[in-house]
Protein backbone atom coordinates (compact mmCIF):
# COMPACT_ATOMS: atom_id res chain seq x y z
CA UNK A 1 0.00 0.00 0.00
CA UNK A 2 1.25 3.47 -0.92
CA UNK A 3 0.05 6.79 0.45
CA UNK A 4 0.64 10.41 -0.53
CA UNK A 5 -0.59 13.52 1.28
CA UNK A 6 -1.84 16.70 -0.36
CA UNK A 7 -2.29 19.69 1.93
CA UNK A 8 -5.55 21.37 0.92
CA UNK A 9 -5.44 24.00 3.67
CA UNK A 10 -3.77 24.46 7.05
CA UNK A 11 -6.56 22.33 8.52
CA UNK A 12 -7.42 19.83 5.79
CA UNK A 13 -5.52 17.20 3.79
CA UNK A 14 -6.24 14.69 1.06
CA UNK A 15 -4.80 11.19 1.33
CA UNK A 16 -4.27 9.32 -1.93
CA UNK A 17 -4.12 5.62 -1.10
CA UNK A 18 -3.14 2.91 -3.56
CA UNK A 19 -3.94 -0.63 -2.39
CA UNK A 20 -2.63 -3.58 -4.40
CA UNK A 21 -4.57 -6.79 -5.09
CA UNK A 22 -2.44 -8.41 -2.39
CA UNK A 23 -3.56 -5.71 0.08
CA UNK A 24 -7.18 -6.30 -0.88
CA UNK A 25 -7.10 -10.12 -0.92
CA UNK A 26 -7.95 -10.69 2.79
CA UNK A 27 -10.98 -8.44 2.34
CA UNK A 28 -12.00 -10.28 -0.85
CA UNK A 29 -11.88 -13.54 1.10
CA UNK A 30 -13.94 -11.97 3.88
CA UNK A 31 -16.46 -10.70 1.34
CA UNK A 32 -16.97 -14.15 -0.16
CA UNK A 33 -17.38 -15.65 3.31
CA UNK A 34 -19.83 -13.03 4.47
CA UNK A 35 -21.94 -13.11 1.32
CA UNK A 36 -22.01 -16.92 1.50
CA UNK A 37 -23.60 -16.57 4.95
CA UNK A 38 -26.23 -14.14 3.66
CA UNK A 39 -27.46 -15.61 0.39
CA UNK A 40 -29.79 -18.59 -0.02
CA UNK A 41 -28.94 -20.65 -3.09
CA UNK A 42 -30.63 -24.01 -3.74
CA UNK A 43 -28.23 -26.92 -3.33
CA UNK A 44 -25.87 -25.10 -0.99
CA UNK A 45 -25.93 -24.61 2.75
CA UNK A 46 -25.47 -21.09 4.06
CA UNK A 47 -21.80 -20.34 4.45
CA UNK A 48 -20.83 -23.10 2.01
CA UNK A 49 -21.52 -21.33 -1.28
CA UNK A 50 -18.30 -21.42 -3.36
CA UNK A 51 -16.92 -18.16 -4.81
CA UNK A 52 -17.68 -19.04 -8.47
CA UNK A 53 -21.36 -19.51 -7.62
CA UNK A 54 -21.38 -16.19 -5.71
CA UNK A 55 -19.81 -14.51 -8.74
CA UNK A 56 -22.52 -16.03 -10.92
CA UNK A 57 -25.54 -15.34 -8.70
CA UNK A 58 -24.56 -12.15 -6.86
CA UNK A 59 -21.90 -10.70 -9.10
CA UNK A 60 -18.21 -9.99 -8.80
CA UNK A 61 -19.04 -6.30 -8.43
CA UNK A 62 -20.87 -7.02 -5.18
CA UNK A 63 -17.85 -8.90 -3.89
CA UNK A 64 -15.53 -6.04 -4.83
CA UNK A 65 -17.67 -3.38 -3.18
CA UNK A 66 -18.05 -5.49 -0.05
CA UNK A 67 -14.27 -5.97 0.08
CA UNK A 68 -13.58 -2.26 -0.38
CA UNK A 69 -16.07 -1.32 2.33
CA UNK A 70 -14.48 -3.89 4.62
CA UNK A 71 -10.93 -2.76 3.97
CA UNK A 72 -11.34 0.99 3.68
CA UNK A 73 -11.04 1.75 7.38
CA UNK A 74 -7.91 -0.36 7.74
CA UNK A 75 -6.30 1.32 4.73
CA UNK A 76 -7.18 4.72 6.18
CA UNK A 77 -5.83 3.90 9.64
CA UNK A 78 -2.59 2.64 8.11
CA UNK A 79 -2.30 5.81 6.02
CA UNK A 80 -2.80 7.99 9.10
CA UNK A 81 -0.06 6.13 10.92
CA UNK A 82 2.29 6.23 7.94
CA UNK A 83 1.88 9.97 7.30
CA UNK A 84 1.73 11.11 10.95
CA UNK A 85 -1.27 13.34 10.35
CA UNK A 86 -3.52 14.11 13.33
CA UNK A 87 -7.13 13.75 12.20
CA UNK A 88 -9.99 15.81 13.55
CA UNK A 89 -13.55 14.83 12.79
CA UNK A 90 -14.88 12.33 10.29
CA UNK A 91 -12.99 11.67 7.04
CA UNK A 92 -14.71 11.54 3.65
CA UNK A 93 -13.62 8.87 1.18
CA UNK A 94 -14.03 8.54 -2.56
CA UNK A 95 -13.15 5.49 -4.65
CA UNK A 96 -11.30 6.85 -7.67
CA UNK A 97 -10.40 3.53 -9.32
CA UNK A 98 -11.74 0.05 -8.70
CA UNK A 99 -9.85 -3.19 -9.34
CA UNK A 100 -10.91 -5.07 -12.45
CA UNK A 101 -13.41 -7.90 -12.31
CA UNK A 102 -10.49 -10.28 -12.57
CA UNK A 103 -9.17 -8.68 -9.35
CA UNK A 104 -6.22 -7.08 -11.12
CA UNK A 105 -5.20 -3.45 -10.80
CA UNK A 106 -4.92 -1.29 -7.72
CA UNK A 107 -7.70 0.19 -5.63
CA UNK A 108 -7.25 3.98 -5.58
CA UNK A 109 -8.84 5.90 -2.71
CA UNK A 110 -8.93 9.61 -2.01
CA UNK A 111 -9.78 10.52 1.57
CA UNK A 112 -10.18 14.08 2.80
CA UNK A 113 -10.05 14.81 6.50
CA UNK A 114 -9.64 17.79 8.81
CA UNK A 115 -6.33 17.71 10.67
CA UNK A 116 -4.83 19.48 13.62
CA UNK A 117 -3.16 22.65 12.33
CA UNK A 118 0.43 23.53 13.12
CA UNK A 119 1.22 26.80 14.88
CA UNK A 120 3.97 28.36 16.96
CA UNK A 121 3.13 28.18 20.64
CA UNK A 122 3.32 31.66 22.22
CA UNK A 123 5.57 32.20 25.23
CA UNK A 124 3.63 31.60 28.41
CA UNK A 125 6.26 31.90 31.11
CA UNK A 126 5.96 35.04 33.21
CA UNK A 127 2.55 36.15 31.95
CA UNK A 128 1.37 39.17 33.93
CA UNK A 129 -2.24 38.85 35.06
CA UNK A 130 -4.19 41.48 36.98
CA UNK A 131 -7.24 40.49 39.00
CA UNK A 132 -9.66 42.35 41.24
CA UNK A 133 -8.54 43.34 44.71
CA UNK A 134 -10.37 41.63 47.55
CA UNK A 135 -10.71 42.10 51.27
CA UNK A 136 -12.64 40.29 53.97
CA UNK A 137 -15.07 42.51 55.86
CA UNK A 138 -16.46 42.04 59.36
CA UNK A 139 -19.94 41.69 57.87
CA UNK A 140 -18.80 38.76 55.71
CA UNK A 141 -17.30 37.03 58.74
CA UNK A 142 -20.52 37.67 60.67
CA UNK A 143 -22.55 36.14 57.84
CA UNK A 144 -20.39 33.00 57.91
CA UNK A 145 -20.71 32.82 61.69
CA UNK A 146 -24.49 33.15 61.49
CA UNK A 147 -24.56 30.38 58.89
CA UNK A 148 -22.62 28.14 61.26
CA UNK A 149 -24.88 29.10 64.18
CA UNK A 150 -27.94 28.22 62.11
CA UNK A 151 -26.72 24.62 61.85
CA UNK A 152 -26.90 24.40 65.62
CA UNK A 153 -30.14 26.34 65.98
CA UNK A 154 -33.35 25.03 67.53
CA UNK A 155 -36.88 25.49 66.19
CA UNK A 156 -39.28 27.23 68.57
CA UNK A 157 -43.05 27.38 67.94
CA UNK A 158 -44.28 30.97 67.75
CA UNK A 159 -47.76 32.49 67.79
CA UNK A 160 -47.45 35.13 65.09
CA UNK A 161 -47.68 35.49 61.29
CA UNK A 162 -45.03 33.63 59.31
CA UNK A 163 -42.11 35.58 57.84
CA UNK A 164 -39.07 34.80 55.71
CA UNK A 165 -36.73 32.41 57.49
CA UNK A 166 -39.47 30.74 59.54
CA UNK A 167 -40.23 27.04 59.25
CA UNK A 168 -43.89 26.25 58.62
CA UNK A 169 -45.67 22.92 58.64
CA UNK A 170 -48.28 22.93 55.89
CA UNK A 171 -50.89 20.85 54.09
CA UNK A 172 -51.35 21.25 50.33
CA UNK A 173 -54.16 20.31 47.94
CA UNK A 174 -53.94 20.88 44.17
CA UNK A 175 -57.21 21.22 42.25
CA UNK A 176 -57.84 21.36 38.50
CA UNK A 177 -61.35 22.07 37.20
CA UNK A 178 -62.76 21.36 40.65
CA UNK A 179 -61.06 17.96 40.97
CA UNK A 180 -58.32 17.33 43.53
CA UNK A 181 -55.33 15.95 41.62
CA UNK A 182 -52.71 15.87 44.37
CA UNK A 183 -52.41 16.29 48.13
CA UNK A 184 -49.59 16.45 50.65
CA UNK A 185 -49.71 16.75 54.44
CA UNK A 186 -47.24 17.70 57.15
CA UNK A 187 -44.66 19.28 54.85
CA UNK A 188 -41.95 21.24 56.63
CA UNK A 189 -40.89 24.25 54.58
CA UNK A 190 -38.50 27.15 55.17
CA UNK A 191 -40.28 30.28 54.06
CA UNK A 192 -38.28 32.13 51.42
CA UNK A 193 -36.12 29.18 50.39
CA UNK A 194 -37.91 28.74 47.06
CA UNK A 195 -37.72 24.96 47.34
CA UNK A 196 -41.42 24.35 46.61
CA UNK A 197 -43.75 25.51 43.86
CA UNK A 198 -43.87 29.06 42.53
CA UNK A 199 -46.05 31.40 44.55
CA UNK A 200 -45.85 29.48 47.83
CA UNK A 201 -43.70 32.10 49.58
CA UNK A 202 -46.06 34.95 48.75
CA UNK A 203 -49.07 32.88 49.81
CA UNK A 204 -47.60 31.93 53.19
CA UNK A 205 -46.28 35.37 54.10
CA UNK A 206 -48.28 36.74 57.07
CA UNK A 207 -50.35 33.58 57.63
CA UNK A 208 -50.59 32.25 61.18
CA UNK A 209 -51.15 28.68 62.40
CA UNK A 210 -54.63 27.45 61.47
CA UNK A 211 -55.09 29.86 58.57
CA UNK A 212 -55.52 28.88 54.91
CA UNK A 213 -55.32 30.52 51.50
CA UNK A 214 -55.29 29.60 47.80
CA UNK A 215 -53.10 30.56 44.86
CA UNK A 216 -52.41 29.34 41.32
CA UNK A 217 -49.22 27.63 40.21
CA UNK A 218 -47.91 25.13 37.68
CA UNK A 219 -47.47 21.60 39.01
CA UNK A 220 -43.88 20.34 38.98
CA UNK A 221 -44.56 16.59 38.92
CA UNK A 222 -47.13 13.82 38.77
CA UNK A 223 -49.65 13.05 36.05
CA UNK A 224 -50.53 16.75 35.67
CA UNK A 225 -46.99 18.07 35.50
CA UNK A 226 -46.84 21.47 33.82
CA UNK A 227 -50.56 22.18 34.21
CA UNK A 228 -51.85 25.17 36.16
CA UNK A 229 -53.74 24.23 39.31
CA UNK A 230 -55.38 26.00 42.23
CA UNK A 231 -53.33 25.28 45.33
CA UNK A 232 -54.98 25.33 48.75
CA UNK A 233 -52.48 25.67 51.58
CA UNK A 234 -53.15 25.40 55.33
CA UNK A 235 -50.57 26.36 57.94
CA UNK A 236 -50.42 23.88 60.81
CA UNK A 237 -47.60 25.58 62.75
CA UNK A 238 -45.05 28.38 62.55
CA UNK A 239 -41.57 27.98 64.03
CA UNK A 240 -38.60 30.29 64.16
CA UNK A 241 -35.01 29.22 64.39
CA UNK A 242 -33.36 30.28 67.63
CA UNK A 243 -29.61 30.63 67.21
CA UNK A 244 -27.12 29.82 69.97
CA UNK A 245 -25.12 32.66 71.46
CA UNK A 246 -21.87 33.39 69.64
CA UNK A 247 -19.63 32.76 72.63
CA UNK A 248 -16.76 30.52 73.70
CA UNK A 249 -19.15 27.68 74.54
CA UNK A 250 -20.50 27.73 71.01
CA UNK A 251 -16.99 27.80 69.54
CA UNK A 252 -16.09 24.68 71.51
CA UNK A 253 -19.26 22.88 70.39
CA UNK A 254 -19.14 23.89 66.73
CA UNK A 255 -15.41 23.84 66.00
CA UNK A 256 -11.95 22.78 67.10
CA UNK A 257 -11.37 26.15 68.75
CA UNK A 258 -11.68 27.14 72.40
CA UNK A 259 -12.76 30.74 71.95
CA UNK A 260 -15.14 32.63 69.70
CA UNK A 261 -12.31 34.97 68.68
CA UNK A 262 -10.30 32.02 67.37
CA UNK A 263 -13.35 30.78 65.47
CA UNK A 264 -13.94 34.21 63.93
CA UNK A 265 -10.28 34.39 62.90
CA UNK A 266 -10.55 30.99 61.20
CA UNK A 267 -13.76 31.99 59.42
CA UNK A 268 -11.97 35.09 58.15
CA UNK A 269 -9.23 32.86 56.72
CA UNK A 270 -11.83 30.63 55.03
CA UNK A 271 -13.62 33.60 53.49
CA UNK A 272 -10.26 34.89 52.31
CA UNK A 273 -9.43 31.58 50.64
CA UNK A 274 -12.79 31.64 48.90
CA UNK A 275 -12.04 35.09 47.55
CA UNK A 276 -8.56 34.04 46.42
CA UNK A 277 -10.19 31.15 44.57
CA UNK A 278 -12.32 33.74 42.78
CA UNK A 279 -9.13 35.61 41.85
CA UNK A 280 -7.60 32.37 40.57
CA UNK A 281 -10.67 31.73 38.43
CA UNK A 282 -10.38 35.25 37.06
CA UNK A 283 -6.69 34.69 36.29
CA UNK A 284 -7.39 31.36 34.56
CA UNK A 285 -9.96 33.05 32.34
CA UNK A 286 -7.40 35.70 31.38
CA UNK A 287 -4.68 33.18 30.56
CA UNK A 288 -6.30 31.69 27.48
CA UNK A 289 -7.42 35.07 26.13
CA UNK A 290 -3.92 36.49 26.52
CA UNK A 291 -2.30 33.50 24.85
CA UNK A 292 -4.80 33.47 21.98
CA UNK A 293 -4.03 37.14 21.34
CA UNK A 294 -0.46 36.17 20.53
CA UNK A 295 -1.06 33.33 18.09
CA UNK A 296 -3.07 32.62 14.96
CA UNK A 297 -4.64 29.16 15.10
CA UNK A 298 -6.44 28.12 11.89
CA UNK A 299 -9.89 26.65 12.42
CA UNK A 300 -11.22 23.70 10.37
CA UNK A 301 -14.33 25.21 8.84
CA UNK A 302 -16.20 21.98 8.23
CA UNK A 303 -15.59 20.69 11.74
CA UNK A 304 -16.88 23.93 13.24
CA UNK A 305 -19.84 24.10 10.88
CA UNK A 306 -20.87 20.55 11.79
CA UNK A 307 -20.70 21.47 15.47
CA UNK A 308 -22.76 24.63 14.90
CA UNK A 309 -25.34 22.65 12.94
CA UNK A 310 -25.68 20.05 15.71
CA UNK A 311 -26.03 22.79 18.31
CA UNK A 312 -28.76 24.62 16.38
CA UNK A 313 -30.61 21.39 15.61
CA UNK A 314 -30.67 20.51 19.31
CA UNK A 315 -32.09 23.95 20.07
CA UNK A 316 -34.45 23.87 17.06
CA UNK A 317 -33.07 27.25 15.94
CA UNK A 318 -31.74 26.45 12.47
CA UNK A 319 -33.27 29.59 10.96
CA UNK A 320 -31.83 31.97 13.57
CA UNK A 321 -28.93 33.55 11.69
CA UNK A 322 -27.96 35.85 14.55
CA UNK A 323 -27.71 32.94 16.97
CA UNK A 324 -25.86 30.89 14.34
CA UNK A 325 -23.17 33.58 14.15
CA UNK A 326 -22.90 33.62 17.95
CA UNK A 327 -22.57 29.84 18.16
CA UNK A 328 -19.98 29.81 15.36
CA UNK A 329 -17.85 32.42 17.13
CA UNK A 330 -18.10 30.50 20.40
CA UNK A 331 -17.24 27.19 18.72
CA UNK A 332 -14.21 28.65 16.95
CA UNK A 333 -12.88 30.11 20.19
CA UNK A 334 -13.49 26.83 22.03
CA UNK A 335 -11.55 24.96 19.33
CA UNK A 336 -8.60 27.35 19.53
CA UNK A 337 -8.58 27.20 23.31
CA UNK A 338 -8.70 23.40 23.34
CA UNK A 339 -5.92 23.07 20.78
CA UNK A 340 -3.75 25.64 22.54
CA UNK A 341 -3.99 23.79 25.85
CA UNK A 342 -3.44 20.43 24.13
CA UNK A 343 -0.15 21.65 22.71
CA UNK A 344 0.93 23.09 26.07
CA UNK A 345 0.10 19.76 27.73
CA UNK A 346 2.25 17.97 25.18
CA UNK A 347 5.14 20.41 25.55
CA UNK A 348 5.04 20.06 29.34
CA UNK A 349 4.73 16.26 28.99
CA UNK A 350 1.67 16.24 31.22
CA UNK A 351 0.00 12.92 31.88
CA UNK A 352 -3.31 12.12 33.50
CA UNK A 353 -3.16 9.71 36.41
CA UNK A 354 -5.94 7.30 37.19
CA UNK A 355 -6.64 9.14 40.44
CA UNK A 356 -6.98 12.45 38.60
CA UNK A 357 -9.40 10.98 36.08
CA UNK A 358 -11.38 9.29 38.85
CA UNK A 359 -11.77 12.53 40.79
CA UNK A 360 -12.85 14.37 37.63
CA UNK A 361 -15.46 11.72 36.82
CA UNK A 362 -16.78 11.72 40.38
CA UNK A 363 -17.17 15.50 40.24
CA UNK A 364 -18.97 15.19 36.92
CA UNK A 365 -21.32 12.58 38.36
CA UNK A 366 -22.12 14.85 41.29
CA UNK A 367 -22.83 17.72 38.93
CA UNK A 368 -25.45 15.63 37.13
CA UNK A 369 -26.76 13.96 40.30
CA UNK A 370 -25.72 10.52 39.07
CA UNK A 371 -23.92 7.58 40.61
CA UNK A 372 -20.27 7.56 39.43
CA UNK A 373 -20.51 4.12 37.80
CA UNK A 374 -23.72 5.09 36.02
CA UNK A 375 -22.09 8.32 34.83
CA UNK A 376 -19.06 6.44 33.50
CA UNK A 377 -21.28 3.91 31.70
CA UNK A 378 -23.01 6.75 29.85
CA UNK A 379 -19.64 8.21 28.90
CA UNK A 380 -18.40 4.83 27.69
CA UNK A 381 -21.51 4.24 25.60
CA UNK A 382 -20.85 7.56 23.85
CA UNK A 383 -17.07 7.01 23.63
CA UNK A 384 -16.48 10.08 25.81
CA UNK A 385 -13.86 8.77 28.24
CA UNK A 386 -10.96 9.97 26.02
CA UNK A 387 -12.58 13.42 25.97
CA UNK A 388 -12.64 13.41 29.77
CA UNK A 389 -8.93 12.53 29.84
CA UNK A 390 -8.34 15.46 27.50
CA UNK A 391 -10.26 17.82 29.78
CA UNK A 392 -8.17 16.80 32.78
CA UNK A 393 -4.97 17.32 30.78
CA UNK A 394 -6.12 20.79 29.70
CA UNK A 395 -6.92 21.72 33.28
CA UNK A 396 -3.40 20.65 34.21
CA UNK A 397 -1.98 22.72 31.35
CA UNK A 398 -3.85 25.75 32.67
CA UNK A 399 -2.44 25.10 36.13
CA UNK A 400 1.10 24.94 34.72
CA UNK A 401 0.72 28.27 32.92
CA UNK A 402 -0.86 29.84 36.01
CA UNK A 403 2.02 28.55 38.12
CA UNK A 404 4.48 30.26 35.78
CA UNK A 405 2.51 33.53 35.69
CA UNK A 406 2.73 36.62 37.88
CA UNK A 407 -0.68 37.36 39.34
CA UNK A 408 -1.29 40.70 41.06
CA UNK A 409 -4.44 42.46 42.19
CA UNK A 410 -5.57 45.93 41.14
CA UNK A 411 -3.53 47.42 44.00
CA UNK A 412 -0.35 45.72 42.81
CA UNK A 413 -0.34 43.14 45.59
CA UNK A 414 0.97 39.71 44.56
CA UNK A 415 -1.70 36.99 44.73
CA UNK A 416 -0.44 33.63 45.96
CA UNK A 417 -1.93 30.99 43.65
CA UNK A 418 0.34 28.08 44.56
CA UNK A 419 -2.36 26.33 46.57
CA UNK A 420 -4.39 26.02 43.37
CA UNK A 421 -1.56 24.99 41.01
CA UNK A 422 0.53 22.44 42.93
CA UNK A 423 1.39 19.73 42.53
CA UNK A 424 1.15 19.27 38.77
CA UNK A 425 1.99 15.64 37.99
CA UNK A 426 3.96 15.22 34.78
CA UNK A 427 5.19 11.64 34.95
CA UNK A 428 2.10 10.06 36.50
CA UNK A 429 2.60 6.83 38.44
CA UNK A 430 -0.41 5.27 36.76
CA UNK A 431 -1.31 7.11 33.54
CA UNK A 432 -4.73 6.37 32.14
CA UNK A 433 -5.50 3.79 29.53
CA UNK A 434 -9.05 3.29 28.39
CA UNK A 435 -9.28 -0.34 27.25
CA UNK A 436 -11.98 -1.13 24.75
CA UNK A 437 -13.78 -3.53 27.06
CA UNK A 438 -13.25 -1.67 30.34
CA UNK A 439 -16.25 -1.69 32.64
CA UNK A 440 -17.41 1.34 34.59
CA UNK A 441 -15.87 0.22 37.87
CA UNK A 442 -12.49 -0.25 36.20
CA UNK A 443 -12.51 3.29 34.86
CA UNK A 444 -13.61 4.79 38.16
CA UNK A 445 -11.36 2.66 40.31
CA UNK A 446 -8.41 0.90 38.71
CA UNK A 447 -7.59 1.12 35.01
CA UNK A 448 -4.28 -0.08 33.51
CA UNK A 449 -1.55 2.39 32.65
CA UNK A 450 -0.76 4.16 29.40
CA UNK A 451 0.53 7.60 28.53
CA UNK A 452 -2.35 10.04 28.29
CA UNK A 453 -1.78 13.60 27.20
CA UNK A 454 -4.31 15.98 25.75
CA UNK A 455 -7.17 14.28 23.95
CA UNK A 456 -6.72 13.65 20.25
CA UNK A 457 -9.67 12.77 18.06
CA UNK A 458 -9.39 9.13 17.02
CA UNK A 459 -9.04 8.30 13.36
CA UNK A 460 -12.70 7.67 12.63
CA UNK A 461 -13.94 5.37 9.91
CA UNK A 462 -14.12 7.13 6.55
CA UNK A 463 -17.51 8.24 5.31
CA UNK A 464 -17.56 6.94 1.73
CA UNK A 465 -19.04 9.08 -1.01
CA UNK A 466 -21.49 7.29 -3.31
CA UNK A 467 -19.46 5.43 -5.96
CA UNK A 468 -20.03 6.18 -9.62
CA UNK A 469 -20.78 2.51 -10.31
CA UNK A 470 -21.38 -0.77 -8.49
CA UNK A 471 -25.00 0.16 -7.69
CA UNK A 472 -26.11 -3.42 -8.26
CA UNK A 473 -23.92 -4.49 -5.37
CA UNK A 474 -25.36 -2.15 -2.71
CA UNK A 475 -27.53 -4.80 -1.06
CA UNK A 476 -24.66 -7.22 -0.57
CA UNK A 477 -22.37 -4.44 0.65
CA UNK A 478 -24.92 -3.15 3.17
CA UNK A 479 -25.69 -6.58 4.59
CA UNK A 480 -22.55 -6.58 6.78
Swiss-Prot record:
Cell compartments where the protein resides:
Cytoplasm
- Domains as described in the record: Consists of 3 domains; the N-terminus binds the ribosome, the middle domain has PPIase activity, while the C-terminus has intrinsic chaperone activity on its own.
Q: Which GO terms describe its biological process?
A: 'de novo' cotranslational protein folding; cell division; chaperone-mediated protein folding; protein transport; protein unfolding
Enzyme's top EC category: isomerase
Listed NCBIfam families: tig (TIGR00115)
The annotated region (Disordered) lies at 447-480
Query: PPIase FKBP-type domain location, by residue?
Result: 165-244
Q: GO cellular-component terms in the record?
A: cytoplasm
Role description? Involved in protein export. Acts as a chaperone by maintaining the newly synthesized protein in an open conformation. Functions as a peptidyl-prolyl cis-trans isomerase.
Describe the reaction catalysed, as an equation: [protein]-peptidylproline (omega=180) = [protein]-peptidylproline (omega=0)
**E.C. designation(s):** 5.2.1.8
- Per the UniProt record, the source organism is Clavibacter sepedonicus (Clavibacter michiganensis subsp. sepedonicus)
Q: What is this protein called?
A: Trigger factor
MF terms from GO for this chain are: peptidyl-prolyl cis-trans isomerase activity; protein folding chaperone; ribosome binding
Amino acid sequence: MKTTVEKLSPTRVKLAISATPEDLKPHIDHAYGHIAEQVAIPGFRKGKVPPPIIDQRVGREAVLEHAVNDGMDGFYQAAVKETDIRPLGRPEADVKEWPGKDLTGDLLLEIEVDVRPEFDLPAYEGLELTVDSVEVTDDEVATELDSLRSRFGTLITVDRPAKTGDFVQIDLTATIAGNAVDTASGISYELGSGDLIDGIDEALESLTAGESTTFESKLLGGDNEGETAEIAVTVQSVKERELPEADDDFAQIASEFDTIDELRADLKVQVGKSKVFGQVTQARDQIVDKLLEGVEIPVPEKLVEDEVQRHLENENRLEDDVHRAEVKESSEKAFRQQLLLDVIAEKEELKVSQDELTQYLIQGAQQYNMEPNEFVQVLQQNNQIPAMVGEVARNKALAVVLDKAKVVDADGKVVDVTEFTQPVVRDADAPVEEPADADAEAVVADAPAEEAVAEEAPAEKPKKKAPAKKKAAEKAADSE
